[in-house]
């Protein structure tokens, strides 16, 4: 079983690349953003709670995120592997994911970070916001707040996964096909 964590700042292309990777490697794609949106749309208790944080551009607390994610993994227990998109975002979440996967005799195989310049990403999100209807992609101040949160809370994950020899950085600038090729080269060499 292969379990890959795909991370990068909002707008780095995680969702786009995850679609290609899940097909190519037959993985179950677990996007925390999609899971949040589903729970918010359906007004679940966890969804209502998550929305209060997302509306401010803040990260959703670990306990809420972890409960949502564990539920999705349990629904897909016969999967050949998982592609975690947007999770973990903090060291506490990484430890919780390791503990949860260990309880199922699994582990994170690799983490791959899509890296790109903030200014390029801001423009990507503002363009996406024009057609996606996603409110959090239409406000530059909220976007920059999300990047600040990422730098403070998510960036330390690089050291955590580097220390475990599971971290790979991939250039997230280029065509979709170029980036997919770079990601595939990393995965094929695991």
From Swiss-Prot:
Cellular component terms per the entry's GO annotation: cytoplasm
GO terms, molecular function: adenylate kinase activity; ATP binding
GO BP, one annotated term: AMP salvage
Keyword Metal-binding set for record: no
Xref: InterPro entries: Adenylat/UMP-CMP_kin, Adenylat_kinase_CS, P-loop_NTPase
Tree of life domain: Bacteria
Localization annotation: Cytoplasm
The protein's Enzyme Commission number: 2.7.4.3
CDD domains recorded: ADK (cd01428)
Subunit structure: Monomer.
Protein name: Adenylate kinase
Organism of origin: Flavobacterium psychrophilum (strain ATCC 49511 / DSM 21280 / CIP 103535 / JIP02/86)
């Amino acid at each position: 079983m292969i379990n890959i964590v795909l991370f990068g700042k909002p707008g780095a292309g995680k969702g786009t690349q995850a679609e290609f990777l899940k097909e190519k490697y037959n993985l179950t794609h677990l996007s925390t953003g999609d899971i949040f949106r589903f729970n918010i749309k359906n007004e679940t208790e966890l969804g209502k709670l998550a929305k209060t944080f997302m509306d401010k551009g803040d990260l959703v607390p670990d306990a809420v995120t972890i409960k949502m994610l564990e539920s999705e993994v349990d629904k897909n227990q016969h999967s050949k592997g998982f592609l975690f998109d947007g999770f973990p975002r903090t060291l506490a979440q990484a430890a919780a994911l390791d503990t949860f996967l260990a309880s199922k005799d699994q582990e994170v195989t690799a983490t791959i970070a899509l890296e790109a310049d903030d200014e390029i990403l801001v423009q990507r999100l503002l363009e996406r916001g024009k057609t996606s209807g996603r409110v959090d992609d239409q406000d530059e101040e909220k976007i920059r707040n999300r990047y600040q949160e990422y730098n403070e809370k998510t960036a330390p994950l690089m050291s955590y996964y580097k220390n475990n020899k599971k971290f790979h950085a991939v250039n997230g600038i280029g065509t979709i096909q170029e980036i997919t090729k770079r990601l595939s080269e990393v995965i094929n060499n695991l």
